[in-house]
């Protein structure tokens, strides 16, 4: 049982050791001379305009949460699509109920005006 997972375990251990080793090695040999210019926020090669700590409209957060909510739908639909033949009619009905619930949620969000951008 463990032999089947041994290559994956070795790969994860090597990756973690390489990442940690690189960080430790660079912190030991790297120069540490902070200055005002180095500590300034960097915006795509341009001089920063205003503060980096700016308040965003709550609509951005609502859209982001809705995206995550409906994006998780794809996470649940993918395994169902892979196992579609094995699950049969029960799996089809189960996913149908899941999609209907998500669709009702989408209609609710739409009616509440969360998707309006004014």
UniProtKB/Swiss-Prot annotation:
Coiled coil regions, renumbered to chain: none
Enzyme Commission number: 7.1.1.-
Highest taxon, organism lineage: Bacteria
Residues annotated as signal peptide: none
Keywords: Cell inner membrane, Cell membrane, Membrane, NAD, Quinone, Translocase, Transmembrane, Transmembrane helix, Transport, Ubiquinone
GO cellular component, as recorded: NADH dehydrogenase complex; plasma membrane
Pfam family, any one: Oxidored_q4
Membrane topology category: Multi-pass membrane protein
Gene3D superfamilies assigned to the protein according to its UniProt record, in alphabetical order: NADH:ubiquinone/plastoquinone oxidoreductase, chain 3
Annotated transmembrane regions: 5-25, 62-82, 87-107
Subcellular location: Cell inner membrane
Chief localisation class: membrane
HAMAP family named in the record: NDH1_NuoA
Subunit relationships: NDH-1 is composed of 14 different subunits. Subunits NuoA, H, J, K, L, M, N constitute the membrane sector of the complex.
Stated family: Belongs to the complex I subunit 3 family.
Function: NDH-1 shuttles electrons from NADH, via FMN and iron-sulfur (Fe-S) centers, to quinones in the respiratory chain. The immediate electron acceptor for the enzyme in this species is believed to be ubiquinone. Couples the redox reaction to proton translocation (for every two electrons transferred, four hydrogen ions are translocated across the cytoplasmic membrane), and thus conserves the redox energy in a proton gradient.
UniProt name for this protein: NADH-quinone oxidoreductase subunit A 2
Protein source organism: Geotalea uraniireducens (strain Rf4)
Name of the gene: nuoA2
């Amino acid at each position: 049982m463990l032999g089947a997972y041994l290559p994956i375990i070795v790969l994860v251990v090597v990756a973690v050791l390489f990442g940690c080793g690189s960080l430790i090695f660079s912190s030991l040999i790297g120069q540490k001379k902070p200055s005002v210019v180095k500590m300034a926020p960097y915006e795509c090669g341009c001089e920063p305009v205003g503060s980096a700590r700016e308040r965003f409209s709550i609509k951005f957060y609502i859209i982001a949460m809705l995206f995550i909510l409906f994006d998780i739908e794809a996470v649940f639909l993918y395994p169902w699509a892979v196992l579609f033949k094995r699950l049969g009619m029960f799996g089809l009905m189960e996913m149908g109920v899941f999609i209907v619930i998500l669709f009702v949620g989408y209609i609710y969000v739409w009616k509440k005006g969360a998707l309006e951008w004014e």
